[in-house]
């Protein structure tokens, strides 16, 4: 992993943690596993990471601007993109987000057990690390 990539990941994590801290009781723990350029597809890359939520943990509404593939490893997670119903996934369950989707719900479905899932993203390198919080969606999600 390059110093620039590590810096971008650290900055993104700090920004997400600040927003998530205001919106949830606990933060997601993200572990970057791999980033590779896609051969024959200039400007495209794939990233692989794990996300862990403590019991009751969640993330604020956000966008990845990537094709996102989720595979649940442990526990139970609830996912929803704007305009679709929420789904609850157990180990082996999968979820997909398109580059245009607003991810409005990403949370541990349990208040007593941790959850962990694998995320694979295919994206334009120019779009950055992804996961940018969407302030207007967060405000709408909190409205009565």
Where are these regions (language model features)?
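Short acidic-glycine-tyrosine-enriched beta hairpin
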Residues: 38, 42, 53, 83-100
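Extracytoplasmic
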Residues: 43-48, 67, 84, 100, ...
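Histidine-centered metal-chelating micro-motifs
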Residues: 58-60, 78, 95-108
């Amino acid at each position: 992993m390059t110093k620039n990539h590590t810096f971008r990941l650290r900055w993104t994590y700090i920004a997400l943690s600040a927003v998530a801290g205001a919106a949830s009781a606990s933060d997601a723990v993200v572990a970057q596993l791999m980033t590779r350029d896609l051969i024959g597809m200039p400007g495209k890359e794939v990233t692989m990471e794990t996300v862990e939520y403590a019991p009751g943990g969640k993330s604020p509404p956000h966008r990845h601007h990537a094709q996102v593939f989720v595979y649940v490893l442990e526990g139970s997670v609830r996912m929803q993109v704007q305009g679709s119903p929420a789904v609850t996934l157990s180990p082996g369950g999968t979820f997909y987000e398109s580059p245009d989707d607003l991810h409005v719900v990403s949370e541990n479905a349990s208040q007593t057990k941790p959850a962990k899932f694998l995320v694979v993203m295919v994206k334009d390198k120019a779009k950055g690390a992804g996961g940018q919080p969407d302030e207007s969606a967060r405000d709408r999600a909190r409205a009565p």
